Amino acid sequence: MTLIYGAVSSLAANPIEKKPFYHFHPGTSAFTVGSWSCNFGCPWCQNWDISKAAPPARPEYVSPELFIELTENSGSQGTSISFNEPTLSLEWSLDVLRLARKRNLYNTFVTNGYMTPEALSLLTDAGLDAMNVDMKGDAVAVKKFCKGIDVEKVWATCRLGRSRGVHIEITTLVIPTVNSAETSLRSIAERIVSDVGPEVPWHVSAYYPAYRFDAPSTPMETLERAWRIGKEAGLHFVYVGNVPGHRYDNTYCPGCGTLLIRRRGYDIAANLVRNGQCPNCGHGVAGVWK
């Protein structure tokens, strides 16, 4: 059992869109928990205050049973294990997922995807429904900036998760001097298409200086270029993230272009998806829309 079993740094009821999940139970709330530390060494970490810290000598303890009780009391429809890398709390997560499944709550991970196939199989068997995987860059960038990490293991997680029925969305924090070059972005977009499918959403999100990295914030034109690259690669759904109100934060039908989901920040202003289809042309819209 891990030493941080049940050690909690943060608890919050969040819109599922904040994870971000845009094609998984939109408009619902996920009761979200984080612990401490990380298995990556990214110098730009946006959650560095918990991911780069060891747990206190006496951390707050939340049992899986209490977490499920808090989830239901918050009015949330599901759980999310996030904020820091959830696989560091594997045993606790497995206990939470099993309890949540019995209570008809959905289960999500926000993860860097660096886990063994055996760990992912345990998670899916326990009730993991969805993962947002942080794809930090191409192989060169990830190895250089994330302390020797092999990005192929992250792609393997995406493929295995998809094959086991897990809903997958992928996020790339677009960072100047790290992964903002056209070649890097195109390689990610093309790998999404080839490895997990063109219908998997890709979130290209704005970076802001944090922790030990002082590159300037992501220019808007870079994010919009990333969006175009994703579409050119054949992705059906590409989103510009961390820019509330941007037109590319909305969902459009890949068949006819109809605006299907209009977002205002993390709120859903309109959702026209019906039975997983566009009401205008009948084209399927990949996702979990229950």
What are the language-model segments listed below?
Residues 1-130:
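Conserved Radical SAM active-site core
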Residues 51-52, 86-88, 113-119, 129-148, ...:
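Conserved radical SAM core fold
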Residues 70-71, 100, 123, 161, ...:
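Generic structural signal for hydrophobic
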Residues 72-99, 142-155, 172-187, 193-194:
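Conserved glycine-rich "GG(E/T)P / GGGxP" loop and the immediately following alpha-helix
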Residues 74, 126, 164, 195-197, ...:
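Structural motif
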Residues 78-80, 106-108, 130-132, 167-169, ...:
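Structural preference for beta-strand elements that scaffold enzyme active sites
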Residues 94-104, 156-163, 220-231:
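Alpha-helix-loop-beta-strand connector modules within alpha/beta enzyme cores
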Residues 178-290:
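Auxiliary Fe-S-binding modules of radical SAM enzymes
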